[in-house]
Curated annotation (Swiss-Prot):
<comment type="function">
    <text>Converts 2-succinyl-6-hydroxy-2,4-cyclohexadiene-1-carboxylate (SHCHC) to 2-succinylbenzoate (OSB).</text>
</comment>
<dbReference type="InterPro" id="IPR029017">
    <property type="entry name" value="Enolase-like_N"/>
</dbReference>
<dbReference type="InterPro" id="IPR010196">
    <property type="entry name" value="OSB_synthase_MenC1"/>
</dbReference>
<dbReference type="InterPro" id="IPR013342">
    <property type="entry name" value="Mandelate_racemase_C"/>
</dbReference>
<feature type="binding site">
    <location>
        <position position="172"/>
    </location>
    <ligand>
        <name>Mg(2+)</name>
    </ligand>
</feature>
<feature type="active site" description="Proton acceptor">
    <location>
        <position position="253"/>
    </location>
</feature>
<dbReference type="GO" id="GO:0006518">
    <property type="term" value="P:peptide metabolic process"/>
</dbReference>
<dbReference type="Pfam" id="PF21508">
    <property type="entry name" value="MenC_N"/>
</dbReference>
<keyword id="KW-0456">Lyase</keyword>
<dbReference type="InterPro" id="IPR041338">
    <property type="entry name" value="OSBS_N"/>
</dbReference>
<comment type="similarity">
    <text>Belongs to the mandelate racemase/muconate lactonizing enzyme family. MenC type 1 subfamily.</text>
</comment>
<dbReference type="InterPro" id="IPR029065">
    <property type="entry name" value="Enolase_C-like"/>
</dbReference>
<dbReference type="GO" id="GO:0000287">
    <property type="term" value="F:magnesium ion binding"/>
</dbReference>
<feature type="active site" description="Proton donor">
    <location>
        <position position="143"/>
    </location>
</feature>
<dbReference type="Pfam" id="PF13378">
    <property type="entry name" value="MR_MLE_C"/>
</dbReference>
<dbReference type="GO" id="GO:0009234">
    <property type="term" value="P:menaquinone biosynthetic process"/>
</dbReference>
<dbReference type="InterPro" id="IPR034593">
    <property type="entry name" value="DgoD-like"/>
</dbReference>
């Protein structure tokens, strides 16, 4: 019979360093839970529940109810059975157990990874570049699908001209484009591939997750790579798109994809061009996700995490 772990958990609540504006809306605060497991020998491991309900995960209230329902105890068998209904809880308890058993999920230093700088949305990106002439990254992401296409297209042209030659640009629509607008973006990006200057790396999630067939057609019709994000935010979705033959990139938000050991095992047997991405978690989940990225992130592609020079939030009990 499995010996239960003792469970402690607490909430956290902090403002994002810069509000994030996407096709999903405005996001200003990060709320979540930290769980701690202790076995009968005193070994401890921590994990983080960082919900992203607009990506289809459980919300914070459901995660809190689950943690309370445990009444301070959980067995390894229960951790295995958390399942897809509570993927963020699955990640937290799975990574805490992994850390407890191995001493640390991080087997290699993630310092060899390169990082991606998220630029402010809209015209604020130009102000950012003007006030930060010494850029600390060589890969940049800019959100689109938030405003009018013509305005964003013109802003992107200015942005492209101001970024240093040789850097990489990722455009992220968060599923906010129509097929027609996505085609116009891809036509523009394909044309830029022939020019010197910054290089477009990919267009991320141009269409809503339900429009998979249309995204397959876009991937076939244009040279610019398409990366799926909202469409592969669970392991079940990832496996389904892999079986269907998706030839583009996969953005993996591991902190919302369930038990990390299960994901790690799947990636061992399914080689895919994966790029690991942040959900604006604290240092706890960040380190655990970057440990997976160290193994499985596509070589020569930056992870979708802020550069190390930016402040990384440590998890402290919520006082709000």
């Amino acid at each position: 019979m499995d010996k239960p772990y003792h469970v402690k958990f607490y909430s956290y609540n902090f403002p994002l360093p810069k509000p994030v504006v996407t096709a999903h809306g405005h996001w200003q605060r990060r709320r979540g839970l930290i769980v701690e497991l202790t076995d009968q020998r005193g070994n401890r491991g921590r994990g983080e529940i960082a919900p992203l309900p607009w990506f289809g995960t459980e919300d914070l209230a459901s995660a809190t109810d689950f943690c309370r329902s445990l009444k301070g105890r959980i067995t390894p068998a229960q951790i295995e059975k958390i399942g897809d209904r509570l993927p963020c809880c699955g990640f937290a308890f799975g990574s805490a157990e992994w850390e407890l058993e191995s001493g640390s999920v991080i087997e290699n230093s993630p310092n060899s990874l390169s990082y991606c700088q998220l630029l402010p949305t809209g015209e604020a990106a130009l102000d950012y570049l003007a006030s930060n002439p010494q850029l600390g990254a060589s890969t940049f992401k800019w959100k689109i699908g938030v405003g009018d296409f013509a305005v964003e297209r013109d802003l992107y042209g200015q942005l492209w001209r101001r970024l240093p030659e040789g850097c990489q640009i990722r455009l992220d629509a968060n599923g906010g484009l129509s097929v027609d607008i996505a085609q116009q973006w891809l036509t523009l990006l394909d044309r830029q591939r022939e020019n010197s200057g910054p290089k477009i790396q990919y267009l991320e999630q141009p269409l809503p997750p339900g429009e998979i067939d249309e995204m397959f057609r876009l991937q076939e019709d244009f040279a610019t790579s398409i990366a799926l994000d909202e469409a592969v935010c669970s392991l079940a979705q990832l496996a389904q798109l892999y079986d269907k033959g998706w030839s583009g990139l996969y953005i993996l938000k591991a902190a919302i994809m369930g038990n990390p050991r299960v994901l790690n095992h799947w990636l061992k047997t399914h080689p895919i061009p994966a790029i690991f991405s942040s959900v604006f978690e604290t240092a706890i989940a960040r380190g655990q996700v970057l440990a997976l990225a160290q193994k499985w992130n596509l070589p020569d592609h930056a992870v979708g995490f802020a550069p190390l020079r930016e402040p990384i939030t440590e998890a402290t009990p919520d006082s709000v």
